[in-house]
Amino acid sequence: MPSVRSVTCCCLLWMMFSVQLVTPGSPATAQLSGQRTARGPGSAICNMACRLEHGHLYPFCHCRGKRD
């Protein structure tokens, strides 16, 4: 069974990778056709980051008690 630390590390790596893909203006951002535009990360990522006390790593997350 994987340790909590390794699972947390994998989740954070996945979040950073997914955020990089959807950040507007990044060179790797996929362009969508029609009326759709690239959106920022969903609240699920921020909720997870805040619960794990890593919200300070994501400037778009507004956690209560967030470190600077």
Swiss-Prot record:
The places in or outside the cell where this protein is found are: Secreted
Name the residues of the propeptide: 28-39, 65-68
- The entry's keywords: Acetylcholine receptor inhibiting toxin, Amidation, Disulfide bond, Ion channel impairing toxin, Neurotoxin, Postsynaptic neurotoxin, Potassium channel impairing toxin, Secreted, Signal, Toxin, Voltage-gated potassium channel impairing toxin
Q: Which N-terminal stretch is annotated as signal sequence?
A: 1-27
Q: In which tissues is it expressed?
A: Expressed by the venom duct.
Q: Name one GO cellular component term.
A: host cell postsynaptic membrane
In this UniProt entry, the residues modified to Arginine amide are 64
Q: Which GO molecular function entries does the Swiss-Prot or TrEMBL record give?
A: acetylcholine receptor inhibitor activity; potassium channel regulator activity; toxin activity
What cystine pairs are annotated? 46-61, 50-63
Identify the main location: secreted
About its domains, the entry says: The cysteine framework is XIV (C-C-C-C).
* Job of this protein: Highly inhibits both nicotinic acetylcholine receptors (neuronal (alpha-3/beta-4) and muscular (alpha-1/beta-1/epsilon/delta) subtypes) and the voltage-gated potassium channel Kv1.6/KCNA6 subtype.
What is stated as this protein's family in its record? Belongs to the conotoxin J superfamily.
Task: Please identify the protein, giving its name as recorded.
Answer: Alpha/kappa-conotoxin-like pl14.2
Q: Which organism is it from?
A: Conus planorbis
